Amino acid sequence: MRMSAGLSLLIPLWGRTFLLLLSVAVTQSRWPSEPSDAVRDWENQLEASMHSVLSDLHEAVPTVVGIPDGTAVVGRSFRVTIPTDLIASGGEIIKVSAAGKEALPSWLHWDPQSHTLEGLPLDTDKGVHYISVSAARLGANGSHVPQTSSVFSIEVYPEDHSEPQSVRAASPDPGEVVSSVCAADEPVTVLTVILDADLTKMIPKQRLDLLQRMQSFSEVELHNMKLVPVVNNRLFDMSAFMAGPGNAKKVIENGALLSWKLGCSLNQNSVPDIHGVEVPAREGAMSAQLGYPVVGWHIANKKPPLPKRIRRQIHATPTPVTAIGPPTTAIQEPPSRIVPTPTSPAIAPPTETMAPPVRDPVPGKPTVTIRTRGAIFQTPTLGPIQPTRVSEAGTTVPGHIRPTMTIPGYLEPTAVATPPTPTTKNPRVSXPTKKPRTPRPVPRVTTKAPITRLETASPPTRIRTTTSGLPRGEPNQRPELKNHIDRVDAWVGTYFEVKIPSDTFYDNEDTTTDKLKLTLKLREQQLVGVKSWVQFNSNSQLMYGLPDSSHVGKHEYFMHATDKGGLSAVDAFEIHVHRRPQGDRAPARFTAKFVGDPAPVVNDIHKKIALVKKLAFAFGDRNCSTITLQNITRGSIVVEWTNNTLPLEPCPKEQITGLSRRIAEDDGKPRAAFSNALEPDFKAMSIAVTGSGSCRHLQFVPVAPPKRVPSEAPPTEVPDRDPEKSSEDDVYLHTVIPAVVVAAILLIAGIIAMICYRKKRKGKLTLEDQATFIKKGVPIIFADELDDSKPPPSSSMPLILQEEKAPLPPPEYPNQSVPETTPLNQDTVGEYTPLRDEDPNAPPYQPPPPFTAPMEGKGSRPKNMTPYRSPPPYVPP
């Protein structure tokens, strides 16, 4: 009994001992063998706690590292393949979104089939975008339980980013890109197709599909094409040397520019075959395949972005200007500081932040590592001025403050002690309730206070403070030049305009450029005149102009940006005016005659620009750069221009005919649409369209009188030196001299005709002479024409010539019985005359012999010839 009771008491004791030994062994096995192991475990737990978002370490989602950061360029396609095998290895669901958000940025598209993230960013998408890729598994209750996640960044660069770098980053074949890269200073030839589309209304998939459909016409890869929206309604490029129309009659949407590279520094002779773009764009085949109307196309040379020039500051300003000193290499600290006062500092609340935009945003999750580029403000609050070191000797105040120049970031002023001046007093520290106040650059009259000199390049301006000796607020900082304008290209006779980008200047108080006041000036602080060929609208911040042939060359201008406090920054840039890209090879010249005097139009740049805009509107063009003004002459207002959209070769006869019928009738009278477009400022009288260049032998619209097209292009403007003299010379040259020449030719021709007529009529008889000598034969000799030297023979005896013999005696008639005294009349003689012949005894009749003397000529006559023939002698019976 006692034994059983002892066993019953030992069993619980052994059980407790066994449990104690077992717990000690387990504890010893889990405790680290060395102190270093314990420390290492503590560090691991600390590191895990730092990277954990939740309070419990076991509930945190593990982070997978392996997706590299990417870069994209505005207007170019972006594509990256996500290695899902690193994230989802067991069939989990992949979710891609912006870090800390539920959806992707508006320019990105995720394809779950190919595990590809692709898109096309616009100008509004610049900056750094953090993308989160997570894998989730479907839980028992139907919800998605996160398993793993990874975050990477995509930085979007602006459109003018270095092309080789951007292309090399996106191209799968680096060797192909390197072979097509142009030199640093060599222009890039780009072909641009203008589409009637709005990229802001497209989803990312539609933008990429548009680029893919364009591949059949461009024959280039996606990463080499660029698609950007139209900015400031500039559909066409003024620097284009080739252009063509599309099938769109008018533009409805904002417009999109789809371009790709053709080569380096090409011209019209070296441009490759573009019939694959020109013909489909005009006939509508391209529009049918792309799904959007095609407005037109053009080819231009784009100058690559050059390194930024050294800032040239104009120092003749009435406001304080920071003196340029050697760059400092001091470590940049956050712009918050402690005011050296024995009381609490005056720090503005975070809601009054006015800091320049920072490219790298702070990610939503603390597990993301941020790679900063440039100056980043760790504390985005508006703090007072940086502390300065002041050396005091006796009664001395802080003197000349000379800010130093730093590379990107904020200005960090340093202090320079001035010699002691016994006339000033030490500043006293004010009460901590005093709020800062921004000093004005204009001298202000206040109470007696110490004077602080601010050293500038311009004449020093005294800034008076109150007796407290501390500034009442953060001083106004001058605007900073962020991006240079550098260079503007213009062409003779072609209207140009340049919108100043909003990121050209930046001011800490007034922010971007559109909040600043811009002024265009010449070298010596001289404002641009009203009659200058370059004008600037400060309200819209638009620079525009219309150069002529006298402005060819390089011109330097200065853009001043002034903030509300009166401080300014300056950017120097150049305007290069080139000669007409087409020269004299334009296929047609349009000439219009308007009512009025040309002098006001020639001397007023605004009227010339208005004329060019109205002419472009009459042709249905929204871009004024399609019109190149050639000349404005007298004779009312005669305006001559060319159309830059016409191809040079071969002769675009159909296009010119279509443009001619759009503005003029067949007889040269302006159409109603053309007149309505230019009225009431310009009233058209007549229009002429003459072929030139490749169409020089054609006349499209008749002109009365026809005007011969000169071989050389006349100047764009009438010279202002002596317009009256030039007009008189034109009148003499085109009116007086031709009239005198024609009159002289007619006079000489009349004289020659008269001489020939007189010579032809010489030797011919008049009608009376012809009537007198009608019959040919022996002429009749009148009595006064006879030779009176010999007496005429007697009429009683017959005429016997000297060579003749004596006549025979008269015959005798023995049977005659009629007495001699019986008179016979003519009838009786006639009756009896034949009776004598019948006498058988009568001798035969013998006629007198002929003349023996020869006939000397037609006009000669025989000598001693009587004017009439004598009858035979009368022989009585």
Swiss-Prot record:
Region named Disordered: 380-444, 458-480, 706-727, 805-877
Reported modifications of this chain: Autolytic cleavage produces the alpha and beta subunits. In cutaneous cells, as well as in certain pathological conditions, shedding of beta-dystroglycan can occur releasing a peptide of about 30 kDa. SRC-mediated phosphorylation of the PPXY motif of the beta subunit recruits SH2 domain-containing proteins, but inhibits binding to WWW domain-containing proteins, DMD and UTRN. This phosphorylation also inhibits nuclear entry.
Glycosylation sites: N141, T317, T319, T379, N623, N631, N643
Stretches with biased composition (Pro residues): 706-717, 841-852
Disulphide bridges: C182-C264, C651-C695
Modified residues (Phosphothreonine): T772
Biased composition (Basic and acidic residues): 718-727
Sequence motif Nuclear localization signal, location on chain: 758-764
Region (O-glycosylated at seven sites with GalNAc): 446-468
GO molecular function, one term: calcium ion binding
Low complexity bias: start-end ranges: 413-433
Assigned GO CC terms: basement membrane; cytoplasm; cytoskeleton; dystroglycan complex; extracellular space; nucleoplasm; postsynaptic membrane; sarcolemma
PPXY motif (motif): residue ranges: 871-874
Region: Mucin-like domain, residue numbers: 316-468
Residues flagged as site, Cleavage: G635, S636, H697, L698
Annotated positions of the Phosphotyrosine modification: Y874
Boundaries of every Peptidase S72 domain copy: 585-694
Keyword terms of this UniProt record: Cell membrane, Cytoplasm, Cytoskeleton, Disulfide bond, Glycoprotein, Membrane, Nucleus, Phosphoprotein, Postsynaptic cell membrane, Secreted, Signal, Synapse, Transmembrane, Transmembrane helix
Residues spanning the membrane: 732-757
Region annotation (Required for interaction with CAV3) ranges: 801-877
Polar residues composition bias: residue spans: 814-828
Leader sequence segment: 1-29
SMART domains recorded: CADG (SM00736)
Assembly with partners or alone: Monomer. Heterodimer of alpha- and beta-dystroglycan subunits which are the central components of the dystrophin-glycoprotein complex. This complex then can form a dystrophin-associated glycoprotein complex (DGC) which is composed of three subcomplexes: a cytoplasmic complex comprised of DMD (or UTRN), DTNA and a number of syntrophins, such as SNTB1, SNTB2, SNTG1 and SNTG2, the transmembrane dystroglycan complex, and the sarcoglycan-sarcospan complex. Interacts (via the N-terminal of alphaDAG1) with LARGE1; the interaction enhances laminin binding. Interacts with SGCD.
Task performed by this protein: The dystroglycan complex is involved in a number of processes including laminin and basement membrane assembly, sarcolemmal stability, cell survival, peripheral nerve myelination, nodal structure, cell migration, and epithelial polarization.
Listed name of the protein: Dystroglycan 1
Gene: DAG1
